[in-house]
Every structure is written in C-alpha cells, then in structure tokens.
Amino acid sequence: MTDAAIVTQKLTRRFGNLTAVDGVDLTVAAGQFFGFLGPNGAGKSTTIKMLTGLLAPSSGRAELLGLDFAAHPVEVKRQIGVVPEGMGLFERLTGAEYLQFVGRMYCLDRPTTQRRSEELLDFMQLSDRPKTLIADYSHGMQKKLALAAAVIHGPRILFLDEPFEGVDALAAGALKALLGRMTERGVTIFLTSHVLEIVERLCSHVAIIHNGRLVAQGSLEELRAGIAGEEGSKTTLEQIFLSIVGQDGAQPPQLEELSWLM
C-alpha cells in the first residue's frame, strides 16, 4: 500500500516562548512500521500528542487516513490506537473489565467485545489472574494490557510510545511478531523508543527530530546512504542517530567529572 496514512504540514506547537515542535513536515505511508526518534526533550511526545488529539497544534495541520484531524476528530480517533508514555489505565478495574470498557467505548457489540477481550488476555498472558486489579499488575503487565486496549477495535494506525519497556523477552518477541503481522495487512505503526536496536530491527522507515525540528526522514537504506564513505551500508541506526543529533556540537558527559565514583 502506498497511500499516506499520516501527513503533517508545518506542524508546530508552542508553550509560551518555547517552541517544542517547529514546522514538522512528516509523511508516513499506510502499512509502514515507522520509527520516530529523538533525544530527550526533542519534541517526540509533543508530536505524538498532536497526532493523537491530546494537544492542538499552535499552527500547521495533521492529516490521518485522508482526514484533517482538526475537522474530523471523532472519525480519526475511531481508527487509531494509542499506547502513550503514561498509560493512564483505570487501576481499580480488572484487566477483563478494562478491555470490555474500552471495547464498548469503541461501540463494539458485547459478544465481539467479550471474545476479543478473552483472546487478547490469553495472547498477552494475562488471563490467569481474572480477579487481579490493574493496580496490582507489574509495569510490564500494565504495558501489555495497554497494548491490548489499543488494538481491541482493530485500528488502522497504532501509536506506540516505548511499548516494550518492562516487558519480558518472551512476551516482547510475541508482541513484535503480532505487530509485524498487523503491518502486513496494512496497519500503520508509529513507534517511538530509545532502544535503537529495536527500531532498527522492526522499522522500515525512520524520522529523527532534534530541538523540535525534523532533521532526517527516510528508509534505513536512505539514511545509511547519507553517511559518507564506503562503510555507509554497514552503519547502524545508533551511529546514524549520533551522527545527526551530534552535529550541533553538543558534547557527551565527561566521566572525569565523576572521578569520585571511579
């Protein structure tokens, strides 16, 4: 599929005198596994909040699935799923109760909601504690439940902010396989993670934001081609990332400053 699932034009968000996101032009094709990277404070979370309707842009526009988000917020939200940085789960519910609530919120009928809830809880290995409140889940269990809630309605775009944080290796492998199958049937996945090895392994295309501005965008092959020298094809995503975000002359922390710890 080649149609664009996400298009932004000069997307900007200001907080007083601070410009957190500055004129971002982004294009994500339908069915892409897309990685969105940047240092801490670069504007990643602010961008995702604008793309998912949690923040209104100061200027510019975001179009999802051919719809202007500002003009058609309800229609867009019906077709997206989100696992945010702060999961915001209702901790006084059980996992099953929460998924049934989310399913009904998306207007799924009760039999469909019940069936999908049970299937998702089984897949996420959460069905063995039917009476356990979410408040008593581990962080990894809560992350898996948040992902289950984000996909229960069959979204066409899935936004994931650090989805594997706290998830054990066995479950993470199953989740990665599931996400890969979803992209094969045309679902667009927009992933942010500080674990660049995960992004490199899963994503076909990447964008890098730095100081609120988009500084790179393209396939991994295109980004590697931008690295000078014959070794460019062997360059890792981490090396690409450090090369790009380090161009402003920022220096890494010096260990000598903490000599009293060594």
PLM feature spans:
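Catalytic Walker B motif of ABC-type/P-loop ATPase nucleotide-binding domains
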Residues: 158-162
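Helical segment within the ABC ATPase nucleotide-binding domain
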Residues: 172-185
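Conserved catalytic motifs of ABC-family nucleotide-binding domains
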Residues: 154
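A short, surface-exposed alpha-helical micro-motif characterized by mixed small hydrophobic
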Residues: 199-200
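ABC ATPase "signature
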Residues: 217-218
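Conserved ABC ATPase "signature" region
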Residues: 100, 104, 111-129
